[in-house]
Amino acid sequence: MGYPKEGETIQIQSYKHNGLIHRIWNETTILKATELCIIGANDRTMVTESDGRTWMTREPAICYFHAKQWFNVIGMLRDDGVYYYCNISSPFATDEEAIKYIDYDLDVKVFPDMTYNILDEDEYADHKRQMNYPKEIDSILREHLNTLLHWIHQRKGPFAPEFVDMWYERFLHYTK
């Protein structure tokens, strides 16, 4: 598996457990890429849904992917603070085309005061049944949801107070 290079622009591709494409973010600038972690950033990038509909993101975002965690984190810079959208997902894979992961439906929305809501539990239950998620996957996803909530409470990793601002500053160097 090759890793994207710092400064390179690449897609992010989200799939479902059945292998079908879920969503594509057209352009993300790579800020850091190692075998353990990829950090990227985008601002007003085109997103294509599985049904072909498109929309544009509204604000700058820092995207955090970890090779050993079954979640990824998007920190969105808004006027009233940093909001986070966390996808419970497979660890990332990369190729020359994109950062890729399997989206497992459960999401966590985190507000600037670090309170959060767990989203899409009904969708997770439906897809778990429809796509026959193995018990092992269900167990891993629940464990990593708990890890994610711990990271939020501890302000660890992408939830650290300076994390999003620091990486956004680096992103600005590529947009000049």
From Swiss-Prot:
* EC number(s) given by UniProt: 3.6.1.15, 3.6.1.6
Cofactor requirements of the protein: Mg(2+)
Residues reported to bind Mg(2+) 1: 87, 103, 107
Q: What Gene Ontology molecular function terms does this protein carry?
A: magnesium ion binding; nucleoside diphosphate phosphatase activity; ribonucleoside triphosphate phosphatase activity
Keywords attached to this Swiss-Prot or TrEMBL record, sorted alphabetically, are:
Hydrolase, Magnesium, Metal-binding
Residue positions annotated to bind Mg(2+) 2 are: 105, 107, 120, 123
Q: Of which family is this protein a member?
A: Belongs to the Ntdp family.
Name of protein: Nucleoside triphosphate/diphosphate phosphatase
